[in-house]
Amino acid sequence: MTSGIIPDRSLPPVHEIRADDAALMLRPETLALSNGLPVYLIRQEGLGVIKLDIVLPAGVRYQQVPLAAYFTARMLREGTQDTSGDQIAARLDYFGSYLEASAERDRTVLSLYAPRRFAGELLPLIAEIWATASFPEDVLETDKKHQKQEYLVNDRRVGWVARQHFASLLYGPAHPYGSVAVPEDFD
């Protein structure tokens, strides 16, 4: 329930950053791998879980074919040259871990959530997924059909359609940020 006071929306909300708020602003350590790739590490001791993000400039704006970035990210977990998608899922499950991949506008992110004590066991698997993903054709075709059906269902929902077209109206349909998928893109 509100207090009955109507805020003045012409003014920004007042919020001061206090000294104790500054403690919540974590600053990453910057390291470099032997190949020169930067690593940004935020330590939060006391947590039993880690989150590892592998981030590459490989998002939607770089794709040459509609939905290529989206399906590439989705397929990362579906197998490698040496490990099937079922084996990957079983190994992650065994260690109480979760792996997600997403294609954003400017980047593709592979994220691992895992108990800290098993991180060392899972890093070789993550490296294998990133380096030798196999993109099985049968799994891709099944996923494309499923995603097309989901698209057709969502395309009848006003809120979803509005979100889809907002960027197109803002940037224009020719801009990478303004592109909107159509059903034929799933074929």
Predicted region positions:
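His/Glu-rich zincin catalytic helix
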Residues: 1-91, 124
